[in-house]
């Protein structure tokens, strides 16, 4: 067995929670994904589906996308399914209530922003390495006969055993019939694209298993493996990363904002973040947690903003600390975002928090380059904070001596 192939497999195994089916030490390709990869003579089709239900992708979403890129780099074809059809229903996985249905126009707008955000992660250039498909290609064409055939492959009992449905059923919260179709539609995607492997978070095991069952039902020559990645804990160190909880780092954030958030994550999360969000070698990390945080922040910011800007950002933020104007929690005043009605102009925030004596002085400070938000210079006098969540734990600075930290 070549050392290059084994190194590739080791990279693909990094951070993986589970593959299924999996018979340990089996050399049969149908029983062990890693045996399959060692023996296959063709590029595999590696499926990952995303429903464009929002406008932002955060680092939690990037975990599976990075794994998809690793398969691309190993010579396989990433099949990125854009769930433009399923997004109009919404994945009920882990949800305690029915999901809001989106209009086709909302979905189309989200699709464009999603594709722009995944470009720094996936290989869009190498021929044969990426196939982008929209599941409306096949799902919009299903007639009632085919829908009934899909429904006939599962029982109500199987559906109610699914996470989210069981909880809602026990609480007598309504479960609508169209929600039962979601796992079947995601599974049918695997039939339509003839997936060899499907990637997902640990919460997607049920849906991926449905895809395996449907591939058997429709007699595909190969049945997909499932590969599950962890659900990333948010920057609060408590709950999963989520925009609604404000504990997320968006891929579209500025270099300064991204670096600042990552540099301050709890020590207990640093190693997991490094393993899942970077390619840093795990056997040669800095000993001190603070140094590991800096290595993490620099590596992640470099991915999305380039190494030059990442190094510049690191130096600028370090300079603030060196001057004794540190952004640590105990050293600067905190101000609750709950004091504002959103959206709110930055000039109002500056005057209301007494960082500036008046709105006119706030405008002058902004125009003169004296205002920074999480290390990033703000020069637009009309800059507006649209919602509180993105600004939790961010530091607002005026000049060299005035600081405050936003809290919920």
UniProtKB/Swiss-Prot annotation:
Coiled coil feature spans: none
Assigned keywords, A-Z: Aminoacyl-tRNA synthetase, ATP-binding, Cytoplasm, Ligase, Nucleotide-binding, Protein biosynthesis, RNA-binding
Catalyzed reactions: tRNA(Tyr) + L-tyrosine + ATP = L-tyrosyl-tRNA(Tyr) + AMP + diphosphate + H(+)
Subunit and partners: Homodimer.
One term of GO molecular function: RNA binding
Superkingdom assignment: Bacteria
Cell location: Cytoplasm
Chain ranges for the short sequence motif 'HIGH' region as given in the UniProt record: 52-61
One cellular-component annotation, GO: cytosol
InterPro entries: aa-tRNA-synth_Ic, Rossmann-like_a/b/a_fold, S4_RNA-bd, S4_RNA-bd_sf, SYY-like_C, Tyr-tRNA-ligase, Tyr-tRNA-ligase_bac-type, Tyr-tRNA-ligase_bac_2
Entry binding sites for ATP: 243
'KMSKS' region, short sequence motif: residues: 240-244
Functional summary from the UniProt entry: Catalyzes the attachment of tyrosine to tRNA(Tyr) in a two-step reaction: tyrosine is first activated by ATP to form Tyr-AMP and then transferred to the acceptor end of tRNA(Tyr).
Organism for this UniProt entry: Thermosynechococcus vestitus (strain NIES-2133 / IAM M-273 / BP-1)
HAMAP family given in the database record: Tyr_tRNA_synth_type2
Family: Belongs to the class-I aminoacyl-tRNA synthetase family. TyrS type 2 subfamily.
Record gene name: tyrS
UniProt name for this protein: Tyrosine--tRNA ligase
């Amino acid at each position: 067995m070549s050392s290059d192939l084994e190194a590739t497999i080791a990279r693909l195994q990094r951070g993986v929670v589970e593959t299924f089916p999996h018979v340990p030490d089996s050399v049969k390709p149908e029983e062990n994904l890693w045996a399959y990869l060692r023996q296959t003579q063709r590029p595999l089709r590696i499926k990952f589906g995303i429903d464009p239900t929002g406008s932002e992708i955060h680092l939690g979403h990037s975990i599976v996308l990075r794994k998809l890129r690793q398969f691309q780099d190993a010579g396989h074809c990433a099949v990125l399914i854009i769930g433009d059809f399923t997004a109009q229903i919404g994945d009920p996985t882990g949800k305690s209530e029915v999901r809001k249905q989106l209009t086709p126009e909302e979905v189309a707008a989200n699709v464009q922003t999603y594709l722009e955000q995944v470009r720094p992660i996936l290989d869009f250039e190498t021929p044969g390495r990426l196939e982008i498909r929209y599941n409306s290609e096949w799902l919009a064409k299903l007639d009632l006969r085919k829908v009934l055939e899909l429904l006939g492959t599962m029982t109500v009992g199987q559906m109610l055993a699914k996470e989210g449905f069981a909880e809602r059923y026990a609480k007598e919260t309504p479960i609508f019939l169209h929600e039962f179709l979601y796992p079947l539609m995601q599974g049918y995607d695997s039939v339509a694209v003839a997936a060899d492997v499907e990637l997902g978070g640990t919460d997607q095991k049920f849906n991926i298993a449905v895809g395996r069952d449907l591939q058997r039902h429709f007699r595909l020559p190969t049945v997909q493996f499932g590969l599950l990645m962890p659900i990333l804990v948010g920057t609060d160190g408590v709950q999963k990363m989520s925009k609604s909880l404000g504990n997320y780092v968006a891929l579209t954030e500025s270099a300064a904002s991204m670096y600042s958030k990552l540099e301050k994550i709890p020590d207990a999360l640093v190693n997991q973040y490094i393993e899942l969000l970077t390619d840093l070698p795990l056997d040669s990390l800095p000993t001190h947690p603070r140094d590991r945080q800096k290595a993490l922040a620099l590596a992640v910011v470099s991915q999305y903003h380039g190494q030059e800007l990442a190094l510049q950002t690191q130096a600028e933020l370090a300079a603030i600390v060196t001057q004794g104007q540190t952004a640590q929690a105990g050293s600067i005043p905190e101000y609750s975002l709950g004091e504002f009605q959103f959206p709110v102009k930055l000039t109002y925030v500056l005057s209301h928090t007494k960082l500036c004596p008046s709105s006119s002085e706030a405008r002058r400070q902004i125009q003169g380059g004296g205002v920074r938000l999480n290390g990033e210079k703000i020069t637009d006098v009309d800059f507006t904070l649209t919602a509180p969540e993105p600004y939790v734990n961010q530091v607002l600075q005026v000049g060299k001596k005035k600081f405050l930290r936003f809290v919920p």
